[in-house]
Amino acid sequence: MITLRKLPLAVAVAAGVMSAQAMAVDFHGYARSGIGWTGSGGEQQCFQATGAQSKYRLGNECETYAELKLGQEVWKEGDKSFYFDTNVAYSVAQQNDWEATDPAFREANVQGKNLIDWLPGSTIWAGKRFYQRHDVHMIDFYYWDISGPGAGIENIDLGFGKLSLAATRSQEAGGSYTFSSQDIYNSSKDTANDVFDVRLAGLETNPDGVLELGVDYGRANTTDDYRLADGASKDGWMFTAEHTQSMLKGYNKFVVQYATDAMTTQGKGIPQGSYGSTFDIGEGDDQLHYVDRYVNNNGKLWRILDHGAISLGDRWDLMYVGMFQKQDLDNDLGTDWWTVGVRPMFKWTPIMSTLLEVGYDNVKSQQTGDRNNQYKITLAQQWQAGDSIWSRPAIRLFATYAKWDEKWGYIKDGDNTLRYAASNNSGFNTTSRGDNDEWSFGAQMEIWW
């Protein structure tokens, strides 16, 4: 029996328990780590074609990486709520027991849901955020990603689709110059690159098929009394259309993208090009001289991409990707990049499987006309928490073989790697790996939760 003297304490404890349940902290994240060796000796090597923006990742990741997310719904009244989300990332070379590293503070934002009565279902947000990212998992390639500090409103229900509006920022070192400052130490400063993003998603096109359309505008935002270097890329556009088809207990995504000028460098919705590095050939000495100045990214980029993950029965799952990307720049520093790959999975039991990943990359230099190509094959035996190709955590043993033939590379000037390309027989020191092959083997864990 609870006496009156004990009643206030019991009420306080009960209120505390209920509050703790209502305000529970969400813990999410991602991590991978392992150990590997190379056939020719030494630690594990990873293989990526020169000029390609990504690599086939199964049995081909040489670092320990983790993202730790803590979040909490801090207030809720009816269907209205505020949610606070954070994310800190770490990456080390997995070479020692003690590897110190500075964390990357990747997310810190607040999301308010259903706060605007005349826009039910919408969310307003502000802060650093991973914003509606689109990627190909098997090559770890983000083709639409404007993440960064920003603000916006998303999931506005229009009846036929959902509209999202956002603005984010990505800082670019250097690029803004002034000649009016009396302080020589303030003669240049970093350039703030702004992105304005509009997306319309959930457009029903056919049974189990939806379309998403997006427009991104990026620009270099200079401070008063500063100006961009002459000829620097000041702004650009990116247009995206993505069709998602639900099929075979999975999906297929077909994507078409077009970008101009400052949006061509990364090709994912973040502007670059107001600053960079290049080189000059000295008159009379034919020597390479490193010059710290802008890089002009004026031009265009086309990308056609198809990727997906499907089930082919009780025992088989499959991931796949095929992509062509053409970066056609006015200064001839672009590339043509072809990539195609598959990752079938055979399930021996609900928790044990064998995976085979085969990937091929071909990259043509716009400047030299030469091509780099690489194919990579990985066989892995895996134990995972479930019978899906997406099931994690997973522990895998792997063996990887890569064969490449590279005819060009980016010019190296000491410790600097420049955007200019040169053929292997040009006489310049380049990043080209030549014609060779290698194999590696090891063990890795991967988890997300």
From Swiss-Prot:
Cell location: Cell outer membrane
Question: Looking at the UniProt record for this protein, which Gene Ontology cellular component terms does it annotate, in alphabetical order?
Answer: cell outer membrane; pore complex
Please, one GO biological process term? monoatomic ion transport
Record GO terms (molecular function): maltodextrin transmembrane transporter activity; maltose transporting porin activity
- Provide the alphabetized UniProt keywords: Cell outer membrane, Ion transport, Membrane, Porin, Signal, Sugar transport, Transmembrane, Transmembrane beta strand, Transport
Q: Which PANTHER family does UniProt cross-reference here?
A: CRYPTIC OUTER MEMBRANE PORIN BGLH-RELATED
What family is this protein classified in?
A: Belongs to the porin LamB (TC 1.B.3) family.
What is this protein identified as?
Maltoporin
* Organism whose genome encodes this protein: Citrobacter koseri (strain ATCC BAA-895 / CDC 4225-83 / SGSC4696)
- Taxonomy-wise, where does this protein's organism fall, top ranks first? Bacteria, Pseudomonadati, Pseudomonadota, Gammaproteobacteria, Enterobacterales
